[in-house]
Curated annotation (Swiss-Prot):
Pfam families: Asp_decarbox
Cofactor binding notes: Binds 1 pyruvoyl group covalently per subunit.
Functional description taken from the UniProt entry: Catalyzes the pyruvoyl-dependent decarboxylation of aspartate to produce beta-alanine.
Listed name of the protein: Aspartate 1-decarboxylase
Native source organism of the sequence: Crocosphaera subtropica (strain ATCC 51142 / BH68) (Cyanothece sp. (strain ATCC 51142))
Assigned GO CC terms: cytosol
Catalytic activity, as annotated: L-aspartate + H(+) = beta-alanine + CO2
Enzyme class, first EC level, given as a word: lyase
Family: Belongs to the PanD family.
Active site feature: S26, Y59
Biological processes per GO annotation: alanine biosynthetic process; pantothenate biosynthetic process
Subcellular location: Cytoplasm
Subunit relationships: Heterooctamer of four alpha and four beta subunits.
Amino acid sequence: MGTIRLMHAKLHRVQVTEANIDYVGSITIDPILLDKVGILPLEEVDIVNLNNGNRFSTYVIPGETGKGEICPNGGAALLCQPGDLLIIYAYENCDRQEVIQRGHTARVIVADEDNKIQDFLIQTLVPCEDGNKVEFHNSSMIDTILESSQT
């Protein structure tokens, strides 16, 4: 059936904290955000700027832990300014038939104005009994995240 590209991670409405034209490409992101959704350093991401509609692709580098940093670098810095809201997507290639048979899971962080986790969503494709399609499910896991951070 072929290969399809599915979102596996998303940072929704993160706020640009800095734009650094002098750095050689990429986007710097707080490692806490990267770890929670499963984006790796050097992974390619697509970015949408909600303030001006700019869309671009780049790769990720981790910033300082816990600082909430979102910093487009190099040419990407020309497409954003501090305060802009971004959506950052990461994808993976999947075998279509395997997704239909076994499903797929994506992790989504919805950020607050300080780039802290406001909501944490698990979005899943669940195989249907007939084996020919999947159902989409969207569940908030914020209570689980908050409980685990308190222990």
